[in-house]
Amino acid sequence: MSLSDVNFKKKLLIVVPYRNRDQQLKIFQYHTKIYFNEDKLDKHLNVKLCILEQANDKPFNYGRLCNAGFLINEDYLDYIVINNVDFLPMIADYSYSDSPMLLIKHGHNNLPMRPSSNSKWIVKGSKRENFFGNSVLLPKHIF
C-alpha cells in the first residue's frame, strides 16, 4: 500500500463559515464541486463540505463556527480544512498531512498571505490582525 492510497482513504472535512455572503457562497460551492470532481489528484479524496452560516446580528464569530463544524462532524473526519468563503480551491494539495498547512498562499493582487490575515484591509494593531482565515489544513489530532 502506497502513501497515496492511505491519503485517499482519509476523510477530509472542509468547513466554510460565513454570514451575509450569499453570492460568494454560490460561487464557492459551484467551484468546489467542479474542483474536487475534475481535478486530477483531488478527485479521489473523500471530501465532505460543511457550510456554516451565522444568522444573528451579533459580531461574526468565525472561530465558533469552525468549532461547531468540527464538533458536528468529529466522527466523520480525519483532517479538516478551514476555508474562507472568499478563497476558492485552486492549485493546492488537499491530501492528508500530519502538520498544519496553509493551502492558499496568495490572495488579492497575488500578494503573499499568512494564516493570520485574510484581507488586504487589515490594519496593524486591530483586533483582526490575529484573525485565523484563508484556507488552512489541520489534522484532527491538532484541531
Predicted regions and their residues:
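Non-catalytic membrane-proximal stalk/linker segments that position and tether the catalytic domains
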Residues: 1-6
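A short, charged/proline- and glycine-enriched loop
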Residues: 7-12, 98-100
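A conserved hydrophobic helix/loop-capping motif in glycosyltransferases and polysaccharide synthases
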Residues: 13-21
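Short acidic, S/G/P-rich loop/turn micro-motifs used as interaction or catalytic elements
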Residues: 20-23, 87-89
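Short, well-formed alpha-helical segments that are part of the catalytic scaffolds
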Residues: 21-36
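Active-site-proximal specificity loops/subdomain of glycosyltransferases
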Residues: 26, 38-77
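Conserved catalytic core of nucleotide-sugar-dependent glycosyltransferases
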Residues: 57, 61-66, 70, 79-83, ...
